[in-house]
Amino acid sequence: FESVSEVFEADIPYIFRSILDNKIKLYENFNPKILAFDIETTSDGNFPDPLIDEIVSISYYSKNLEKVTIIRDFKKEHDYIKSVASEKELLKDFQETINKFEPDIITGYNSDRFDMWFIKERASKNEIKLKLKPFDEDMIYTQGARNDKPVKIKGITHLDTYIFIRNVLAPRLKTNSLSLDNVAEEMLGQKKLELGVLPHEAWLDDSDENMNKFSEYNLLDSKLTYLLAEKILPIALQFSRFTGLPLFDVTRMRYGRLVEQFIIKSAIEQDRVIENRPSNDKIIKRRATQAEGAFVYQPTPGVYKNIRVF
């Protein structure tokens, strides 16, 4: 239109805009059913490749659920262990477990980059289209930051506990490693079960004793993930309320994005117009333009009275 010189706020996602325009208050009186899961795979010691390696067990943990489904039969010491004959049956059981439990939130530790992605790829390899409730639809990939490949399930919030800890809580942690073992030890006072060898090496020993221990190891990973998710959820929910963004999105943002979203939300609530995100050309020009820094007065060392702080 000739009468329109410029369009503002065109790049604000529709869902976010709708939440703010309709003054929707997110997650009030929210008491979600959380389901944590963890997978174990075969590999040659390198990072598992879904084109080659298989999923051999999946564990699930929640307040009222402890379960390990494994593709090997043996004398079981625990009622929570279920044996299936193949990976295809394992993946079908994954679908059945989620649909029966009907979680509000499903969580894994590094599930964006590993568990969810691996399950989706192996389901495709086995020619299985997962139908997950409440909409009986398959998982879908979304665009994420860096190399992350967030997986969405319609009607269920996928919370990657590791991603949120990495993006938000890591600077406050003493540990230099964000492995599940180290983070759980610092935040929960609990550690993973020691197998003595790497999981894919432990899988080679099919004795009853070892397979029971392998199942315990797999289940504990899910339990630790569940407990961590419970611990971080109140913080994540507050960020959702501050920014007006759904939990799936807000838990995958770093502080810079969170602050930006809070400013956008505040501006819209104050009926202020928000400029569009700058183009690449504008960003290059801004970086090329240098501004003189402010004068910083260096005080003489000593003891002073009547100090004013701005």
Where are the language model's segments positioned?
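Short, well-ordered loop/turn elements at secondary-structure boundaries
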Residues: 29-31, 54, 100-106, 152-154, ...
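Flexible loop/turn segments at secondary-structure boundaries
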Residues: 43-45, 113-116, 166, 235-236, ...
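Active-site-proximal helix-loop-helix substrate-binding element of RNase H-like nuclease domains
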Residues: 67-70, 76-85, 102, 116, ...
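Short glycine-rich phosphate-binding loop at a beta-alpha junction
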Residues: 103-111, 241
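Common nucleic-acid-contacting/processivity interface regions adjacent to the catalytic cores
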Residues: 201-310
